[in-house]
Amino acid sequence: MSAPKNEMYYSLLEWFKTLNLNAPHADAESLADGVALAQALNQFAPESFTDAWLSKIKASAVGSNWRLRMSNLKKVTQSVYDYYSDVLNYSLSDFSKPDLQSIAEKCDLGELERLLQLVLGCAVNCAEKQSYITEIMCLEEELQANIMRALQELEATRQASSAEGGVVSSLSRSPRTGILDSKAVQEDRDALAQKCFETEKKMLLLIDEKTNLQQELHKLQQEFARLEQHSTVIGDDGVSLGPVQSGSVRYNELRRQLDLLKEELLQSEGAREDLKLKAQQQDTDLLHMQMRIEELMKSSAEVTTLKDEVDVLRESNDKLKICEAQLDTYKKKLEDYNDLKKQVKILEERSADYVQQNAQFEEDAKRYANTKGQVELFKKEIQDLHAKLDAESSKNVKLEFDNKNLDGKNLALQRAKDSLLKERDNLREAVDELKCGQLSSNTALTGTTVSRELQPSATVEKLQRLEAENKALREGQGGQTALAQLLDDANKRCENLREQLKTANERILSLSHASQSDDPILKESEFGKQIKQLMELNEQKTLQLEEAVTQSTSLQCKVTQLETNLSAREQEILVYDAKYRKCVEKAKEVIKSIDPRIASALDASVLEKSADLVEDEPKPKMSVMEEQLMTSAFYRLGVNAQRDAIDSKLAILMGSGQTFLARQRQSAPRKSLSAMKSK
């Protein structure tokens, strides 16, 4: 089928002119800008060639600006190729792509023919293809033939036929896999639809050819009838052919024409029968294809249902994964909850221990509060002892001064003694009898006076006071060992006082005898004894003061240590209490997040447990060692205080304003137990 050059282009242009477009599309120059082609594609498939895509085509790309036309043609060609591959599933790999540059610059008709051929394929494959096919059928026969040839060339390049057979055979061999592969089913359905469309086009062409042959046959029959009616026929050269008789030239010519027409008629009848058979075969194929399409539609419905089921299963799988993740988190939370339970139990035990320790600390604090009062008393007593120490130190200075004076006097007396020894030897024999008589009378008188003076004033008062103190101690501390010790100490002191009273009486007698005799040796010995006694008293006082100071310092150290321990214990209790509360709050929050009913039940159980622990908690008892230490310290303090009071009273009685004899009549202050033990 050879055709003149660019005949297909003009046929396609005539078809393109039938489209109702806004842009000019009457010649090649108007089509070279791509605007009319874009509008036609938008009219064919608006879902693929959208208005937004159409707005990208620049309508001002006319004139000499071939680059703008090139840009528009590139957009149109790329969109057409995408439409063929994505929507129609056509492969245009064998179809030569039109040269857009030659179209934009030179308006090349051959390249524009290829582009119009692609646009024609979009028209006959779109959703409104039937209307466009009817418009093509309304054109002239030559135009229809050229358009059909263009479509056949375009169909020849499609590479989906082989894939069609493979898909159908695979679907027939394994229907289950074809059902699951929805894409293959869709491609198969599109291929069958395309094949049906092709058969329809072929049927239309065959019908048209049949009508044409019938028309030609009718014309020939009319011509034959006309020739038979006329007896004479003039040929082309103007010569009469003569009547139609056998053997004549005209008869032979007509016979030859009739044979040719019969042969052509037979050929046409054979072609018609072939076409009938082909049409029947195509009808059967069409029925099979329709049945296949129905089966594929059913399979596609099943595929959609299976897809829905797969989506449901996928969603359920996702939900299962989420639930598994939540289950893992809940397991971790449960493990954390069990750990928190264990920690809460440990903290409850610790809190119970801390409550017991707190109660013990409170009792210790109460005891320490009592000891604080005693410490304050000890401090006051220490201050008094310091004052006494100062007084004793001043007395010691005075005694040292008196000792120095007595040393001077002792030297003077020693000198007088040496001078008087000689006189004593001379006068001893003469004065001996007189001296003895005077001594006897004086001793009797002085003994009675001393006994009379000392008996009511010193001893009786001291004995009464000691008995009263002993009685008060017995009544206050009834029947304890420390009071018995105090009583023994008081009795010992009474005996010591009596012995001191006897020694004082003897001293008084000796001093009175020495004063009467005016013997410097005796005076010196008496003064030495007094100095020794004063030194002993001074040493005793210093020892007592040192013991009191050491005891007070040790007590202060103990009190400070106990206070620091108590404060540290209180701080520890506060810290542990805060930690316990935080842990309990965290545990409550975790339990509330899991289940608020469990949290309320646990709160009630915790309160009951804490109440039971407080009720069943045994009160801490003081240890035996602590009781013994407290009692011994208390009685030691009482003994020391009583001793200091007695010593202070004795010191007051032994004032500096009394005479030598009055001071000698008073009992000497008692020595401390530590001094007695050291001696």
From Swiss-Prot:
CDD domains: HkD_Hook. One of its GO terms (molecular function) is dynein light intermediate chain binding. This is Protein hook. The lineage of its organism: Eukaryota, Metazoa, Ecdysozoa, Arthropoda, Hexapoda. GO terms for cellular component: centrosome; endosome; microtubule; synapse. GO terms for biological process: cytoplasmic microtubule organization; cytoskeleton-dependent intracellular transport; determination of adult lifespan; endocytosis. Gene3D superfamilies: Calponin-like domain. Keywords: Coiled coil, Cytoplasm, Cytoskeleton, Developmental protein, Endocytosis, Endosome, Microtubule, Synapse. The keyword Manganese does not apply. Its main location: cytoplasm. Residues 135-437, 480-574 form a coiled coil. It comes from the Eukaryota. It is found in: Cytoplasm, Cytoskeleton; Endosome; Synapse. The keyword Coiled coil applies. Pfam families: HOOK, HOOK_N. Residues 6-123 form the Calponin-homology (CH) domain. The coiled coil domain mediates homodimerization. Involved in endocytic trafficking by stabilizing organelles of the endocytic pathway. Probably acts as a cytoskeletal linker protein required to tether endosome vesicles to the cytoskeleton. Involved in modulation of endocytosis at stages required for down-regulation of membrane proteins that control synapse size. Not involved in synaptic vesicle recycling. Required in R7 cells for boss endocytosis into multivesicular bodies (MVBs). Has a role in regulating adult longevity. Homodimer. Interacts with microtubules via its N-terminus. InterPro entries: CH_dom, CH_dom_sf, Hook_C, HOOK_N. PANTHER family: HOOK PROTEINS (PTHR18947), PROTEIN HOOK (PTHR18947:SF39). Belongs to the hook family.
